[in-house]
């Protein structure tokens, strides 16, 4: 489950709580279960959008549990395979939060499809083995080409070099930069300098409550640094 109100599993399968994984990393964002508190709901949304972004921007095949795109929490039960009731069922009744989430997932999938550099079949080398001017995959912090942010900062940038693959048009893919900030404070990340006349464009910012994916790509005001708001993800294209 990716919904942000997990809690410990319950003994409801007659297996004395020995079924499933012993690892249950969870957070309720300050309130257990359903809530009308806007702050808690917004924090859960942020966590959910961060998790989904990591899934779709990773190189491997994205895997979703049924209902992840519909705010399905299984009422905090992470082991509901034996629950033929409301706990294990997916509620497809539409609501505002669900519609916004489904739109976000659709756009994540569409972006991934449009940019083959994210889903390369070959393993990443993390070096410039084809002499393209930068590694196929690189990590960045408050300094470009350096992944050494202190752990307490909770932020880092990832760049996929589009020159290593061609898109459906037979042309090199764009540069793809993802800035992750898991911290409760604002973080600034460095943007690598692009070759030639290429510029960085902001495509997505999950800190935006209405539309995480911008209606139109926006030229980054600062071509050297990007501000990532608390517990959010930004996506940029270099082209």
Model-inferred region functions:
Residues 1-10:
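Single conserved hydrophobic/aromatic residue that forms the stacking wall/gate
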Residues 3, 19, 29, 65-66:
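Short glycine-rich loop/turn motifs that provide flexible caps or phosphate-binding loops at active sites
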Residues 9, 35, 41-45, 49, ...:
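Carbohydrate-interacting/catalytic domains
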Residues 15-28, 74-86:
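Short, compositionally biased low-complexity segments
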Residues 18-41, 98:
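Metal- or metallocofactor-binding catalytic centers and their adjacent structured scaffolds
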């Amino acid at each position: 489950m990716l919904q942000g109100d997990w809690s410990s599993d319950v003994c409801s399968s007659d297996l004395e709580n020995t079924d499933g994984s012993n690892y249950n990393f969870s957070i309720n964002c300050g309130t257990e279960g359903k809530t009308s508190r806007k702050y808690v709901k917004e924090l859960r949304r942020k966590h959910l959008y961060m998790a989904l972004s990591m899934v779709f921007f990773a190189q491997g095949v994205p895997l979703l549990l049924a209902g992840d795109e519909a705010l399905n929490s299984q009422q905090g039960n992470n082991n509901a395979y034996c629950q033929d009731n409301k706990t294990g069922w997916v509620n497809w009744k539409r609501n505002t939060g669900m519609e916004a989430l489904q739109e976000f997932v659709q756009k994540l999938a569409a972006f991934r499809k449009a940019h083959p550099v994210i889903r390369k079949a070959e393993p990443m080398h993390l070096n410039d083995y084809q002499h393209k001017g930068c590694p196929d995959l690189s990590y960045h912090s408050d300094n470009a080409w350096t992944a050494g942010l202190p752990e307490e900062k909770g932020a880092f940038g990832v760049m996929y070099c589009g020159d290593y693959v061609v898109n459906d048009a037979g042309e090199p893919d764009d540069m793809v930069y993802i800035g992750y900030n898991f911290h409760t404070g604002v973080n600034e990340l460095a943007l690598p300098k692009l070759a030639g006349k290429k510029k960085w464009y902001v495509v997505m910012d999950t800190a935006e409550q209405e539309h995480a994916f911008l209606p139109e790509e926006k030229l980054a005001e600062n071509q050297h640094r990007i501000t990532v708001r608390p517990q959010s993800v930004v996506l940029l294209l270099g082209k």
